[in-house]
């Protein structure tokens, strides 16, 4: 059983600054980290490895220079995967969902897999598209919002997901792509032994050419900016008579 768990390196939101001049975001001081939602996918994959005999877990990511960071690689491997594959190329530096999914699908095909796990979304964009797009590109079943994995056999995965007013149980034929929600588990903090052992695990570094990737982005991002801040008007209306109520209503109309 070959399980691939996908993850994305995202900027640490605590260190993102806003340029006052134009509202653009400054990522220069923001270190990269594993997207919080993908930590759940990594944990789920490693829990399955404990249940399935001879299962192997491969962590997979596509991106830019953030994936060259040795500390980041060790962080991923210390959480349980047996090996790591990173696809590094400048074109993936700010990749959007369609491009990311196409690259992940190509890399997964090259690596081989029975099951692909990923987070429901990413901490930066949270587009909630990549998992389903990977399934569409590979022409295999894809399910999102999975909150519990019930069982795994050689050819079927049984899962649950919480809908608005019911719990849905699904049997999914393998190979398949499953996007998990944060309700599925609580990611463990790696032990010192796991952190030290991560340095001995294999890492494969591929380029876009290595996976035969030559797709162009369907659309391009023009700008990312923080919402413009409006100054508070600080209007105080004293009294509770009809005139004050009318003034209050008039001011509400101006801002709605």
UniProtKB/Swiss-Prot annotation:
Entry's Gene Ontology BP terms: carnitine catabolic process; carnitine metabolic process
Pathway where it operates: Amine and polyamine metabolism; carnitine metabolism
Gene Ontology molecular functions: electron transfer activity
Record's keyword annotation contains Endoplasmic reticulum: no
Record-linked PROSITE patterns: ETF_BETA
SMART domains, alphabetized: ETF (SM00893)
Keywords in alphabetical order: Electron transport, Transport
Source organism, top-level taxon: Bacteria
Keyword Magnesium found: no
Function: Required for anaerobic carnitine reduction. May bring reductant to CaiA.
Database matches in PANTHER family: ELECTRON TRANSFER FLAVOPROTEIN BETA-SUBUNIT (PTHR21294), PROTEIN FIXA (PTHR21294:SF17)
NCBIfam families linked to this entry: PRK03359.1 (NF002888)
Quaternary context: Heterodimer of FixA and FixB.
Similarity section: Belongs to the ETF beta-subunit/FixA family.
Protein name as catalogued: Protein FixA
């Amino acid at each position: 059983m070959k399980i691939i768990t996908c993850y994305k390196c995202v900027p640490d939101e605590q260190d993102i600054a806003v340029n006052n001049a134009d509202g653009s975001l400054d990522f220069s001081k923001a270190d990269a980290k594993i997207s919080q939602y993908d930590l759940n996918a990594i944990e789920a994959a490693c829990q399955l490895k404990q249940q399935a005999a001879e299962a192997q877990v491969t962590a997979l990511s596509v991106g830019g220079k953030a994936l060259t960071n040795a500390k980041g690689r060790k962080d991923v491997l210390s959480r349980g995967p047996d090996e790591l594959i990173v696809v590094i190329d400048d074109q993936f530096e700010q990749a959007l969902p369609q491009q990311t999914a196409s690259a992940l699908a190509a890399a997964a095909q090259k690596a081989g897999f029975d099951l692909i796990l990923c987070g429901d979304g990413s901490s930066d964009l949270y587009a909630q598209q990549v998992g389903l797009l990977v399934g569409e590109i590979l022409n295999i079943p894809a399910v999102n919002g999975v909150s519990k994995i019930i069982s795994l056999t050689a050819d079927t995965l049984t899962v649950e997901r919480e809908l608005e007013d019911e719990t849905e149980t699904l049997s999914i034929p393998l190979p398949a792509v499953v996007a998990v929600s944060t309700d599925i588990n609580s990611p463990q903090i790696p032990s010192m032994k796991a952190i030290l052992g991560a340095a001995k695990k294999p890492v494969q570094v591929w380029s876009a050419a290595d996976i035969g990737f030559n797709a162009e982005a369907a659309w391009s991002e023009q700008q990312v900016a923080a919402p413009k801040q409006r100054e508070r008007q600080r209007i105080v209306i004293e009294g509770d008579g009809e005139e004050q109520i009318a003034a209050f209503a008039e001011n509400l109309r101006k801002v709605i």
